């Protein structure tokens, strides 16, 4: 992992279920309250590394994500204070094996936490240069835009309110 400013092995990766309107529209629903799941630090990879689909699986899917990298301990902080604990933001891809998703019953351990399934980077944008309410993500597949959406970093940060430095929320 060699993205400047992004931890090689974050202590925690907290992922938000259905963080973007485009994903909610694809699924036809949005949860009333945000829910989260954890990914292993070993799932982190650098941009451009090869992702391997395990034998016996066929539904390897992407989810473009905005990764918020926590730079200072964030315990019992208000939503208004949360951005001051952010080191920066970068792009991420939350790969998943959808053939295993139903069997995992929401834990996502086998389907989304495999080695290399969370590429980060290529660069960390310092928090001072990125506003928490104006983050956008665009994902291309074979040169075609497959995702173009935005979200509030406040939603992503709320997952990290008990986090220490080198945590990542996607």
Question: Could you tell me what each predicted segment is?
Answer:
Residues 1-63:
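Extended, compositionally biased flexible segments
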Residues 1-6, 23, 29, 98-170:
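Catalytic-pocket segment enriched in acidic/His residues
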Residues 24, 47, 77-79, 99-101:
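Short helix/loop capping segments that flank catalytic or ligand/cofactor-binding pockets
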Residues 42, 71-75, 95, 127-129, ...:
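Short loop segments at secondary-structure junctions
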Residues 58, 65-75:
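Phosphate-binding/catalytic loop of phosphoryl-transfer enzymes
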Residues 65-69, 90, 138:
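Residues embedded in well-ordered beta-strands
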Residues 75-90:
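N-terminal accessory regions of nucleic-acid-interacting proteins
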């Amino acid at each position: 992992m060699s993205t400047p400013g992004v931890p090689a092995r974050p202590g925690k990766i907290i992922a938000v279920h259905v963080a973007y309107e485009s994903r909610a529209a694809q699924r036809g629903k949005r949860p009333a309250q945000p829910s989260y799941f954890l990914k292993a630090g070993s799932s982190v990879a650098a941009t451009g590394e090869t992702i391997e689909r395990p034998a016996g699986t066929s539904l390897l899917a992407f989810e473009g994500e905005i990764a918020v990298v926590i730079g200072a301990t964030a315990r019992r902080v208000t939503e208004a204070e949360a951005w001051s604990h952010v080191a920066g933001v970068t792009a991420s891809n939350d790969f998943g094996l959808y053939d295993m998703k139903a069997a995992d019953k929401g834990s996502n351990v086998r389907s989304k936490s495999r080695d290399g399934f969370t590429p980060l980077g290529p660069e960390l944008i310092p928090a001072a240069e990125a506003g928490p309410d104006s983050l956008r993500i665009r994902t291309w597949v074979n040169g075609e835009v497959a995702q173009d959406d935005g979200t509030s970093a406040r939603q992503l940060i709320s997952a990290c309110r008990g986090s220490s430095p080198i945590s990542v929320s996607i």
